Amino acid sequence: MKRLILVTSPPACGKTYVSKELAKALNPIVYLDKDTLIVLSKQIFVVAGEEYNRSSPFFEENIRNYEYDAIVDLALESLDYSDRCLINAPFTREVRNVEYMRSLRRKLQEKGARLVVVW
């Protein structure tokens, strides 16, 4: 069965180390790191003339959820071509949101995949 592995925890808790070690052990796997998307987010701050602050109301209102949507969309698409995908991202709000997790599991079920959360 296909799997989406979500390595999640608050920022700066060792997710990247754990994610990379797990990805090496499970190779072949599609590895997606939300930090890679930050380059795009930084540019949005510049274009909007906003100070770069990932805790700001501007970030919360205009960027945060789109980053998560983008990485999940990439992961779901990758499951069309690979049996395993690992996302390295905090997802701290999302894993506590029952409806969000149900929706994600439904999308994965349509792909013949299941969700594995590593906290």
Language-model regions, residue ranges each:
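Pre-Walker A (Motif I) flank of P-loop NTPase domains
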Residues: 1-4, 82-83
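Hydrophobic anchor at the beta1->P-loop junction of P-loop NTPases
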Residues: 7
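P-loop (Walker A) phosphate-binding loop of NTP-binding proteins
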Residues: 10
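ATP-binding Walker
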Residues: 13
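Walker A/P-loop
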Residues: 16
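Conserved substrate/cofactor phosphate-moiety recognition/catalytic segment
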Residues: 20-70, 76
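A glycine- and Lys/Arg-enriched "phosphate-lid" helix/loop adjacent to the NTP-binding pocket
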Residues: 52, 57-58, 108-119
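Glycine-rich phosphate-binding loop used to anchor ATP phosphates in small-molecule kinases
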Residues: 62-111
